[in-house]
Amino acid sequence: HAVATANCTTALHLALLAAGVGPGDEVVVSPHSFIASANAILHDGASPVFVDIRADTLNMDEQAVESAVTPCTKAILAIHQIGRPAELTTLAETARRHHLTLIEDAACAIGSEYRGRPIGCNDWSPLVCFSFHPRKVLSTGDGGMITTNDAQLARRLRLLRQHGMSVNDLERHKARTIVTEEYPILGYNYRLTDVQASIGLGQLRRLDALLARRRAIAARYDAALAGAPGVQLFREPPHCRWNQQTYLVRLPGVTAARRDAFMQALLDAGIASRRGVMSIHREACYIERFGRQSFPESEAASDQCVCLPLYTQMTDVEINQVVAAVRQHAPRA
C-alpha cells in the first residue's frame, strides 16, 4: 500500500498516529536531522528521546538505541540521513525485542537500497515515510507518501489523511448508487493534490535515469576530491546503495565559523552550498522544552559538514569548477 500525503511532515505525523503514539509516549530518534523529524513526535503529544549518531554514517548509532528504551517507549524513528540507509537489521531486531513499532523517515531516501532491497519495501518496518520536496530526487513541488505492508494500517492512514472520511472521493464518484460518507474518527486534510500526483507519476517513470545521473556525478566528485587536503569524503558501505540526493563532505576538526568562511569563499566564486545536517537539540524551542543536551557526534558533524552542488543537469565543467574551488579554499584544521 502507498498512501500519498501533502508532504513528509504530514506523513510522519500520520505514521506516528497510526502506530498509536500519543501523549506520554516516547519515540527514539536521532538529533541529527531536519527539525520536522522530531516536531512530528511533539505534534503527537509524545517526547523525542535522542540517540547520538555514528560519525561514519551520520545515522543514529543502532547499538546505542537499546539503552534509550524505557517503559514509555512506543516507537523507534529511523532516519535515512541524506538518503543513506540506517542499519535497519539491528533496529528492527531491537524494535521486535521490545515490542515497539519501527518507523522509517525516508524523506531523502527514494531510490536508495539496503541489503539489496529498496527503501520503502517494508521488509524491516511497517511504515516508511517519503518526501517529494523540491530538494528530493523525485519531486512533485511538495508532497509525501507512506508505504505499508499492513492493510489495517493503510486503511487507518487513509481515514486520518482525509478528515476521517469513510469513503474517498474517487469511490464516491464512481459509485452507481448514492453513497453517504461517514466520519468514524477525527482526521486531517493531509491529501496530495491530483496535479502534484500527476507530476509525481511522470517523475517516477524517470527515476532510474535521475538516479543514474546523480550517481555518476557523485562518482566524479569522489575521484576528483580523493586526497584533497582538509576534505573528508564519505564512502558507501557494501550493503547499501545511496541515491546521492546530497553530496556531503566533511572538513575535519574545523569550527562552524571556519566552515561558514569556506562556504562564503565558495559563494564568492559563484558556487552555492549548504551547511550539513542540523542538530535539533541545539535549537531554541528544544532547549526550552528539554534543557541543554549534549550529543557530540551530531554537533561535530553539524559544524563541519558541507553539501556541495549536485543536480541532474549539472555539467562536467560545473563539477570541475566546484572541485577546483573546494581544493583551493578547504581550511586546514
Residue ranges: model-predicted function:
Residues H1-G22, G45:
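Conserved core of the PLP fold type I
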Residues Q63, S67, A75-I79, R84, ...:
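PLP-dependent aminotransferase class I/II
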Residues H1, P23-E26, C72, R155-R156, ...:
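Short acidic capping loops at alpha-helix termini that bridge into adjacent secondary structure
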Residues T5, V51, L308:
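Hydrophobic residues at beta-strand termini and immediately following loops
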Residues C121, F130-S131, G144-N149, L201:
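Short beta-strand-to-turn element immediately C-terminal to the catalytic PLP-Schiff-base lysine
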Residues E104-L138, R155, V179-P184:
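Conserved active-site segment immediately N-terminal to the catalytic lysine
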Residues V3, V28, V49, T101-I103, ...:
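Structural detector of well-ordered beta-strand residues that form the stable sheet scaffold
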Residues L17-A106, E113:
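PLP-dependent aminotransferase-like
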